[in-house]
Amino acid sequence: MEELSADEIRRRRLARLAGGQTSQPTTPLTSPQRENPPGPPIAASAPGPSQSLGLNVHNMTPATSPIGASGVAHRSQSSEGVSSLSSSPSNSLETQSQSLSRSQSMDIDGVSCEKSMSQVDVDSGIENMEVDENDRREKRSLSDKEPSSGPEVSEEQALQLVCKIFRVSWKDRDRDVIFLSSLSAQFKQNPKEVFSDFKDLIGQILMEVLMMSTQTRDENPFASLTATSQPIAAAARSPDRNLLLNTGSNPGTSPMFCSVASFGASSLSSLYESSPAPTPSFWSSVPVMGPSLASPSRAASQLAVPSTPLSPHSAASGTAAGSQPSSPRYRPYTVTHPWASSGVSILSSSPSPPALASSPQAVPASSSRQRPSSTGPPLPPASPSATSRRPSSLRISPSLGASGGASNWDSYSDHFTIETCKETDMLNYLIECFDRVGIEEKKAPKMCSQPAVSQLLSNIRSQCISHTALVLQGSLTQPRSLQQPSFLVPYMLCRNLPYGFIQELVRTTHQDEEVFKQIFIPILQGLALAAKECSLDSDYFKYPLMALGELCETKFGKTHPVCNLVASLRLWLPKSLSPGCGRELQRLSYLGAFFSFSVFAEDDVKVVEKYFSGPAITLENTRVVSQSLQHYLELGRQELFKILHSILLNGETREAALSYMAAVVNANMKKAQMQTDDRLVSTDGFMLNFLWVLQQLSTKIKLETVDPTYIFHPRCRITLPNDETRVNATMEDVNDWLTELYGDQPPFSEPKFPTECFFLTLHAHHLSILPSCRRYIRRLRAIRELNRTVEDLKNNESQWKDSPLATRHREMLKRCKTQLKKLVRCKACADAGLLDESFLRRCLNFYGLLIQLLLRILDPAYPDITLPLNSDVPKVFAALPEFYVEDVAEFLFFIVQYSPQALYEPCTQDIVMFLVVMLCNQNYIRNPYLVAKLVEVMFMTNPAVQPRTQKFFEMIENHPLSTKLLVPSLMKFYTDVEHTGATSEFYDKFTIRYHISTIFKSLWQNIAHHGTFMEEFNSGKQFVRYINMLINDTTFLLDESLESLKRIHEVQEEMKNKEQWDQLPRDQQQARQSQLAQDERVSRSYLALATETVDMFHILTKQVQKPFLRPELGPRLAAMLNFNLQQLCGPKCRDLKVENPEKYGFEPKKLLDQLTDIYLQLDCARFAKAIADDQRSYSKELFEEVISKMRKAGIKSTIAIEKFKLLAEKVEEIVAKNARAEIDYSDAPDEFRDPLMDTLMTDPVRLPSGTIMDRSIILRHLLNSPTDPFNRQTLTESMLEPVPELKEQIQAWMREKQNSDH
């Protein structure tokens, strides 16, 4: 294509301007030409052939276009691909920089976690071979670029590229470049000896630029980079005649190099999402403002600006430029420049942030995507004498979390500090230069792929990084100590560094240990400080985590330099100085700050205040907010995993990481206690975050690589308390077994990582999720109690509102409501943190892994387990801590109640098998309360209790191992729980038996268990003991519940008589009301248990009768039934009439129906005799009253009533017969009397102790307790010896007595 003349270029450009176009034509020019700005045309001639490719070193001065601020970009100049100096309007620098910053920013993609997980070798260690993610990205980036084509880039073009990236010139001073006076002098003296190679030139350029900034006090060298109000005119003055400049419609920008109006209006608009006010065209004289306290929005306007009046063309162009958007990519904070004291301050009409404080303040780093708008008061003029190193700060608001919307600056306490000093501007310059290299590579991949250009760009990057290291050390200004904050932290927190910048900084400095420490220790300290000040009330909390995560992931070869540095910090694992070692570790250790973010109200009150303190918290709002908070937690925990995983991958720090993990576990052992002082242990949020990371580390572990005896290993990192309860062994048993196992063996082999990680994760569950669950349940209980108190106070208001205690009751009601509101909000936070279904599923899957390990210990043939197990309990299993089993039960109990949908996972089948195996082999567990917990889990999954777990319960009852052994095992436990060894055993047994009875009712409906039930019914001894316990429980429960109903009736009657009630003293009234409340609780509880027990009787007597008629059971059963009939229908039955009987679960008609059904189902001569022999409760009138009530209330059919009447008549006949044949045996000799009951023996037997008792009496005792009643030694029925001689003597005496009486 022919080259265009200067007149043709000028004509076309004026035509475009006249048409209102601001973009350039896309037709590339054959040689670099430059357009002129509006106004008087500037003569230009077409360059000669030698000038067509770039800048002549000897007679031309390179200059760059003001990339970024001025809105001027370069356009494609050559068909050979020299497009590094150009940009079309559709591919403006802003678009490219935004794209680059988003696609190549420091953000790690979501797959990185999974990729890093795939590198775990759990057999030999955590790392086998790993390819760095950054290396993969770089290779992928390079492979995407097109291969080099066309002629090689000349030296002139290379110089032009260098000058463009560094924005320098060494010939003419210009507003758009930094003039290098030293280089200019050298070029004038001997141009050929200025530099030996490009590396040398780059170093000279950077050093001169940076030294200029340090040596000039009243002039800022970077001020020349701030575009004027007429960027095209400025470009026209550029000494580089080969550059074609234009005013793009979407120019690339930089917050460092922007025009006054552009920065004032648009930069803050982009940074804070505020709407910029229109920028007026006034560029005349304005008052001078001091630099130190200037508003951040005017920082750029304090750079040196020519004070000469601008031409009309300039003003017009400046107005247009002022409306250009400005990117905030590399300036997370707007700072005040110390060189602006002599310049003219151009006031911006945009809203300005709050005034800068005179003392350093922490400033929150911002998200580059979403920021709330904010305005602040204008700043007063400041004295020009403010020092240049005076620190100032600016609040940068993070983007909001779940609630969205804007927020005032003062609502954020997250803040950081950045000094407004020369180092900041030097860093801005170096970061911009580094980023422009990437922009050039993206714009011109063909040219940049040429080896020479690629090497040049690599040198530029390296030199930028090297000089950044010098700046960070203070080598160019004042040396900095390790305690001073790093200038780089704010950029990292804002995610504003170019891709690869921080990695290159690590690569460049890590080989010099001192330099590396001097640069990165302040960075690490700054990130930790940022993490401490973060909260989940905004999404800013993740940025310190992301920054540290990326630092830790940076590796070179097999070394992670930052991981080495982190693990070498003095506070990596500080020694404990107080009893509160758990809280100390969280507060003082380096990683503690990063693991501490939490949604729990007791950990972070800001979360509950922001999300759950509205006037009306609806269920839907709470659900949405909870999901958002759970998403935040997931993001933060993923970053924590990257950090700890990187430290583990690094071979040099793996031991330190494992030591830290073990220290967290060991320091928080007290969290497992039922009552814990929260001040001494880590917070729930910290522990759950720690648990989540360990779960991720354990995901790929195979059980074949886990040593189940690790907890007994001499080099085990976990310290168990000496009093830790074992599954089925005492500490003496454990010590003896360990001596036997390891006493004569050679030294132990080192534990492998999979084993250590598995057990650390197991103990982390014990110390995190389960204490949190217990706290959650306690909170729910407190909410219920407060609700009940509030309801009682409201319901009884009519009784106390006119009493002297009215004021006290109102205050109590107010306090209860306030506390209730607080607890409900705390519960909402806990719902978000604890009821996260995905998190609960992870816990369940890990417990599934634990169950597999336990089942392998119980039976090596797993999964082909056969029951019953070997009678000898494996010593490994017996010696394990009891909570290994208990935690499984507790966690299942929790999710069945509060998140049953999380129950169905692939591991569910193993969980079902484990429950069945443990319940069918109760001898494997020493603690009966642990077996009771497993029973309670099965009870809770019963469809009658939790309909959503029906499938799980069906898996249990239909499991092949359960059909034969589950029913007998539960029946045995029903009787064994009579004696648990605890002081509360008498009351505990009722709840446990209630659970078993409910399970039996469900199993009875399953045809697969019918045969087992019938076998048990007919087997004799076991079932007889079971029936005896049923009789005992029914007797006690019905008696207690009916007695409590009588007391309730009595108090209610007193309170109905208001006059009599008011005459009672106040303390007596309170005592009666307190007794009423207690009786109501007791009656509700006991009636529920009694109803279940009677239901069981009703079912059993319908199926089988013979066991109930045994001599040791029949009379007791008949006496129990007669007594309860007397309670329900006797002369005092009216005492059971209470208000709202359904409130207590009292259904007298149903109870009478069931009791009379039991009579009918056991109707036979033997049972009739047992009824007649009960002289305590039976009477003819009682049975007549029962028949009358059943007829009157229609409780039974006529046929059933007639059958009951026939039974009553049969019993009455036996009573009359007994009366006629009654013989008095009260004068029997003492040797014929039973020593326990003092009645005449009919079948004497000798106990091992030598005592002689009646067989029926001792058998009845053995049903309750298998011990000798006189010395408490173990006693069974087989140990009883008949005494036939004594029996014959007793019978002879009885015959003699009968004959004498007649």
Curated annotation (Swiss-Prot):
N-acetylmethionine: residues carrying this PTM: 1
GO molecular function per UniProt: ATP binding; enzyme binding; ubiquitin-ubiquitin ligase activity
Bias (Basic and acidic residues): 134-147
PROSITE patterns registered for this protein in UniProt: U_BOX
Pfam families per record: U-box, Ufd2P_core
Subcellular location field: Cytoplasm; Nucleus
Reactions catalysed, as given in the entry: S-ubiquitinyl-[E2 ubiquitin-conjugating enzyme]-L-cysteine + [acceptor protein]-L-lysine = [E2 ubiquitin-conjugating enzyme]-L-cysteine + N(6)-ubiquitinyl-[acceptor protein]-L-lysine
Keywords: Acetylation, Cytoplasm, Nucleus, Phosphoprotein, Transferase, Ubl conjugation pathway
Protein's UniProt keywords contain Acetylation: yes
U-box domain segment(s): 1227-1300
Composition skew (Polar residues), residue ranges: 51-64, 299-327
Annotated effect of mutating residue 121 to A: Abolishes cleavage by caspase-6. No effect on cleavage by granzyme B
EC number of the protein: 2.3.2.27
Residues carrying Phosphoserine: 23, 31, 84, 88, 90, 101, 103, 105, 124, 238, 383, 803, 969, 1265
InterPro entries: Ub_conjug_fac_E4_core (IPR019474), UBE4 (IPR045132), Ubox_domain (IPR003613), Znf_RING/FYVE/PHD (IPR013083)
Sequence segments annotated as region (Disordered): 1-155, 299-406, 1057-1077
Complexes and interactors: Interacts with VCP/p97. Interacts with STUB1/CHIP and UNC45B.
Primary role: Ubiquitin-protein ligase that probably functions as an E3 ligase in conjunction with specific E1 and E2 ligases. May also function as an E4 ligase mediating the assembly of polyubiquitin chains on substrates ubiquitinated by another E3 ubiquitin ligase. May regulate myosin assembly in striated muscles together with STUB1 and VCP/p97 by targeting myosin chaperone UNC45B for proteasomal degradation.
Protein name listed in UniProt: Ubiquitin conjugation factor E4 B
Organism expressing this protein natively: Homo sapiens
Gene responsible for this protein: UBE4B
